[in-house]
Amino acid sequence: MSNLVIVESPSKAKTIGKYLGPDYTVKASMGHLRDLPKSTMGVDLEADFEPKYVAVAGKEDIISDLKKAAKNADTVYLATDPDREGEAISWHLMHLLGLDESKTRRVTFNEITQKVVQQSIASPRAIHQSLVDAQQARRVLDRIVGYQLSPLLWKKVRRGLSAGRVQSVATRLVVDRENEIRAFEPKEYWSLDVELARQGKAGGFVARYWGDTKKRELENQAQVQQVLDAIADKPFTVTSVKRADKKRSAAPPFTTSTLQQEASRKLNMTPKRTMAVAQQLYEGVDVAGEGTLGLITYMRTDSLRLSNEAMADAASFIRSRYGDSYYYGKPHVFKTKSSAQDAHEAIRPTHVELDPERIQSSLTREQYRLYKLIWSRFLASQMANAVYDTVAIDTQCAGHTFRSTHQSLKFSGFVAVYEEGRDDEAEAVGSPLPDLQEGEQALCTNTKPEQHFTQPPARYTEATLVKAMEEKGVGRPSTYASIVSTIQDREYVNKTDKRLAPTALGEVVTQLMMERFQDIIDVEFTANMESRLDDVEAGKQNWKALLGEFYGQFHQEMVDAEAALEGVRLKVPDEVTEEICEVCGKNMVVKIGRFGKFLACPGFPECTNTKPIVEKMPGSCPKCGSTILKRKSKRGYAYYACERGTECGFMSWDVPTANDCPKCGQTLFKKSGRGRMKPFCINEACEDFLPEDKRGYYKKAESKSAEEKPAKKTKKKGTSK
């Protein structure tokens, strides 16, 4: 019996093929094979929003190969990812390949392990049309908004702009935060620390002003001086000593959102890169001594659920490696929020016994670091609470209370494996305190008043923006990474020192949207639309009825906006830089030309000075050790050169990385382009040197000599073909 299994990627095909016998052929579709056309909207607005799907250009050979394989198979298993997108890919495959429903099966894998793959093949199902419809509804919604709104932005703001339904809301979040920062008015406050010495005993300690009869802030220097005058030359008395054990429980295992946040904080990985590496770990990696293994469960999920088997495996591993006292005592179950799609588990390792160090040699640096993060977080979630010994001591003088606090780790529990990162500053632990007793006297040896001002809300990082989107219901696990990436790619938002700020363009477009398309830019409206798409998936809402309701209002807003903006052209303010024009002394501004951004003098046309924008790269020049700069050729191609220019002479088309060669210590480079690029050494004196012909460049076809070229056919006058 012949069976065909179709998945999205070759790596996934390789892993699954290992678990199935010779009766199964596993092939990859390489993603979507059918989609809306790129050149037109592809949605018939007059025919109940019927999508006009076409085969994806450039995939004709794949389609032909799959059709041939499907024709010769007795059963076809569609094994694409277990979410809306995966369900839609399977549905498109069935229609595009002309598969017979009676011999077509749908299978999904929450994890790609031998047990799960074989169980899924043994218990297939039909395609869930409600999941497909939810994906179609989102796709058509986004296409309508993009294709109708983008031309308006071209005409009224700048050519080449594009608008997106959810990306517009994400940009607004960044713009709103920037406006909060601008409107923020700092308020003064003071802290007052006193250094105290015990009377007749060794050991001093520091206490901070807390209040009088109740906690209060010192708002200005005058209030501080009142306290200083009151306590001058007076003894302090210890009025309260409170000791307690404070327990801290582990964070739950990762969801998509929390994985992206933590990878951003701890690994400095963008959400987009995090998902790309997680996809590699899910689909399968060649592990020495084990073969190809899927190392983590499906990475697009908002569920905190763990299988009983996974929790039992974790319990066994914890007891074996750390001892019984480090286990939580029972399966630690975390409550999933009501809006979560609970079809999947949380993100966890598929084989907890494969600890990161054991398989490190089989993984890339990124894979290892992300796998270690996922493995540690999962294991910690099933471990005992950490216990801290805390002490709080109050001392009083002249009716004023000063407090000292300290905490120390008493039992590490889950902290032995993992501790969650933070976006804000960690709570001060305080210095160790002497063994003070109530009623004990102390003398003040020094005072330290300090002025402070309240700080504005911080700009979003990629991590905190993902967190805000999740909290507000904007987007879903499958879309967070692409949204954060898109608003930067389209230059509505810039990232500087890991913080996101709106560009002048982003603010102009957001203001236009807020004035003319209030629903599209509204956070609540967008969150409600996500909920209604969930209803489509659950079979509670007809997807075309949802589109009809949305389009009626959106179309009217489009008509009104066109009328209101007739003859209007919105100006985007130039971005002013710190770069000074050496000709006239003005601050240069950023302009956009044929080959991208460049610096120009705002004094044009009197001053025509321009400069390329220079971007510093990681690593150092392999010839002289100076900084490497990213530059652009006259044709707009990026290359990398030493900051010393012709004095040094180094340049390369390859991209410098932040990693050094383990053999010679020079900066490693990688081939430019998308996808997984393995770094290599370009130092010819190094034993790890990789010659240019092995770096994966495309070879230009050698030009044929005149003798080899076929003669051109000439057409005689007066003759016809």
Give the residues covered by each predicted segment.
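Structured, non-catalytic alpha/beta "coupling" segments that mediate domain-domain communication
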Residues: 14-37, 168-217, 381-431, 593
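Alpha-helical scaffold elements adjacent to nucleotide-binding pockets in ATP/GTP-utilizing enzyme cores
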Residues: 15-19, 65, 88-96, 116-120, ...
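Basic, low-complexity terminal or inter-domain segments flanking catalytic cores
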Residues: 2-4, 15, 150, 183, ...
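Short helix-coil junctions and helix-kink-helix linkers
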Residues: 258-271, 466-476
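Metal- or metallocofactor-binding catalytic centers and their adjacent structured scaffolds
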Residues: 214-252, 440
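C-terminal or mid-to-C-terminal helical accessory/interaction module adjacent to the motor/catalytic core
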Residues: 112-194, 244
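Core structural elements
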Residues: 138-149, 166, 196-198, 246-258, ...
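Intrinsically disordered, low-complexity regulatory segments
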Residues: 1-136, 148, 211, 330, ...
